[in-house]
Amino acid sequence: MALTALPPLGAIGMASPLFAAAPAFPGFGLAGILLTATGLTALATGPRRLLLPAVPLLALLSLVAHVYAPARPRPPAQIHAISTRLGRSPTDLSSWLNRNLALRTLVRHTLHSTPSGSTLLFPEDAAGPWTRWSSVFWRTTAALARARGDTVLLGATLADPHGGLLDALIGFGAHRVVTSARQPIPLGSWIPAGRRSYRADWSRFGPTTIAGRRVAVLVCYEQLLIWPAAWAFLSPHPPGLIIAVSNHGWATPGIREPQIQANAATALARLFGVPEVSAANGPRPIADAGSRKASDLHPEQ
């Protein structure tokens, strides 16, 4: 079980049985994962003489977890998640410019409508490819955010200095940060032998610090895996918040994967006993498919 839950095999181990730790041991975090792994392994391979004492013990620990689990904590009031309906990522200069113009309008509007000192979270790949012109394009917005003491977090595709691409979350304004997915989706983004593959990072442990907060950032596919969240909490100073960003601009009506992914992120937050803030991008409204304007972004805070 550990082989399929941890990288490299864990790179494709979505919907692991270890997700049972969330309802079984809420708030237990890493200990809950270990207890679940122990219980499932014992049920599958253990001799009956060991199961008789083990099952009641695990049931008792689960009861303790439910009795003493704190109420689901609320996210910090300073963090505002804005979901969008931008559709698929831009593939040419014209679509990139139109998308970023509309996104910039929304960012500036949100800056003016939230209290100073806020952190604004936008979805995975909201800004599309981050080029050398992106910093120029966003310069005045970054200055506005900095003057207000705000931090803006945009999902973007970033060129990796070591080759390939990064599925990144870029922060500017009062606090600057760049972090990226530990595990992009296999074959779709992460192609180990591909020259333009998104890079995986299996050796990065601990939280990311954003606007003075220790957070666990889960980018899209990572929300369906156990180990990226576990890696973030393997620290003497674990995160106090899960930030989940995703991009489902490709989704068609009836696709359930976005909801399954959102449920998985919520389960991880329950397991580790921390609040969750999420921002997702969805498909563009069918009626407006021929044009894009600021109102297409449909902010949801």
Report residues per predicted region.
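Non-cytosolic juxtamembrane linkers/loops
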Residues: 60-112, 253, 257, 267-269, ...
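Soluble catalytic regions of membrane-associated enzymes that act on cell-envelope
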Residues: 69-185
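Short, contiguous clusters of charged residues that form electrostatic/catalytic patches at enzyme active sites
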Residues: 31-39, 101-108, 200-202, 226-227, ...
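Hydrophobic alpha-helix-in-membranes signature
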Residues: 52-55, 122, 206
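Solvent-exposed soluble domains appended to multi-pass membrane proteins
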Residues: 127, 132-135, 139-147, 157-301
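Membrane-embedded alpha-helical bundles of multi-pass enzymes
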Residues: 1-65, 275-276, 280
